[in-house]
């Protein structure tokens, strides 16, 4: 059995690193609030990096779950551990242009405390330029000094680059503001965010506020402007479908059977004390790689509430019939998935050898 596994691993490496195969890889830039170590943000980076059909052009890092500089450090260290330091890590926005922690705290005092406030959360609050000691050890590599990276890449690879967004949309809003052609030159925008209906869950966080979602809430003005930009295609993985997923102890035990660097990272930093996590961003990434994972979807016009009232940051959606024609664009909204296939795909990717740079 060990010899058979070795043969499969060698075959995987030969295919993934062959010149012809590399030319067929789909290009993506990951924009992510890369909190870590472990957890769904790091596992999303691995989902895309581990796929032999994906070429990760770079990772832009935006404040969200944690502050940007802390997230950059986690990302650099992850790439060191899996041997992919060739992928540039580009620091993005530290703060949303409009929202600040003070405003977020005042909003919660008036309208109710949110379940998760990311970098602003009292439970782990620190100043934006403080980097706590990393459990995985400090990175030895440095972030890339790449001003305008997002814009430069979509101009270099016209209509070939998918923008994967797993955090607040601050970086994308800034890119659109600097270059009005940014969105139209990309292949597509794929993002995790928003909530479009009442999710099928007993989780009180989402039952009481089904249209509230952290990525939109952290920077609603950015999300609204990005969703109004002229993308060729927009695909949304909302809360509704995300809460149907969860990384389980059984999945981690299966991953533990592999000695790949990705597998060892996932196992070491699995946050078991919280009973596993919804696989929000991993699902968005996996469904971009293999759209057949999604078994039900809809199309709605989508925007974000920016009135600074009780619904600030909430998701707004319309059908073609009731669309107010105020700039919202049509978005493909995922509604259901083949959960068994998704779980298997994630486990298999984590157990596989990491594709080399090309």
What are the language-model segments listed below?
Residues 11-20:
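Hydrophobic h-region of N-terminal signal peptides that target proteins for export
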Residues 23-77, 84-85, 122-236, 242:
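Active-site histidine-anchored catalytic micro-motif
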Residues 103-112, 203-207, 251-252:
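Short, surface-exposed amphipathic charged segments that create phosphate/polyanion-binding patches used
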Residues 42, 69-73, 93, 101-105, ...:
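Extended, subdomain-level signal for the structured scaffold at the beginning of enzyme domains
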Residues 1-8:
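Bacterial N-terminal signal peptides that target proteins for export
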Residues 24-26, 43-55, 214-358:
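Conformational coupling and interaction surfaces
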Residues 87-137:
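Surface-exposed loop and adjacent secondary-structure segments within mature catalytic domains
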């Amino acid at each position: 059995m060990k010899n058979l596994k070795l043969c499969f691993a060698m075959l995987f490496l030969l295919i993934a690193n062959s010149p012809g195969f590399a030319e067929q890889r789909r290009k993506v830039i990951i924009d992510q609030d890369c909190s870590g170590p472990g957890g769904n943000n790091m596992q999303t980076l691995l989902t895309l990096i581990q796929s032999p059909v994906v070429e990760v052009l770079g990772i832009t890092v935006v404040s969200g779950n944690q502050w940007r500089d802390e997230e950059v450090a986690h990302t650099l260290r992850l790439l060191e551990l899996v041997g992919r330091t060739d992928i540039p890590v580009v620091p993005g926005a530290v703060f949303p242009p409009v929202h600040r922690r003070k405003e977020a705290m005042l909003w919660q005092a008036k309208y109710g405390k949110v379940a998760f406030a990311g970098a602003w959360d009292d439970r782990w609050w620190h100043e934006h330029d403080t980097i706590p000691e990393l459990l995985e050890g400090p990175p030895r590599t440095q972030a890339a000094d790449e001003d305008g990276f997002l814009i430069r890449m979509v101009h270099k690879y016209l209509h070939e680059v998918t923008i994967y967004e797993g955090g607040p949309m601050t970086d994308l809003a800034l890119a659109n503001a600097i270059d009005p052609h940014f969105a139209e030159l990309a292949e597509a925008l794929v993002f995790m965010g928003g909530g479009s209906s009442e999710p099928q869950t007993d989780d009180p966080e989402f039952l009481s506020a089904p249209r509230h979602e952290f990525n939109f809430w952290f920077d609603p003005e950015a999300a609204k402007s990005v969703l109004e930009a002229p993308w060729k295609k927009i695909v949304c993985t909302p809360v509704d479908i995300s809460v149907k997923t969860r990384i389980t102890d059984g999945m981690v035990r299966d991953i533990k059977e592999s000695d790949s660097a990705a597998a060892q990272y996932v196992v070491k930093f699995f946050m078991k004390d919280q009973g596993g996590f919804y696989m929000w961003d991993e699902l968005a990434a996996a469904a971009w790689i293999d759209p057949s994972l999604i078994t039900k979807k809809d199309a709605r016009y989508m925007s974000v509430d920016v009135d600074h009232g009780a619904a600030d940051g909430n998701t707004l959606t319309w059908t073609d019939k009731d669309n107010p024609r105020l700039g919202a664009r049509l978005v493909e909204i995922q509604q259901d998935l083949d959960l068994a296939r998704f779980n298997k795909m994630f486990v298999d990717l984590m157990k596989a050898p990491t594709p080399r740079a090309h």
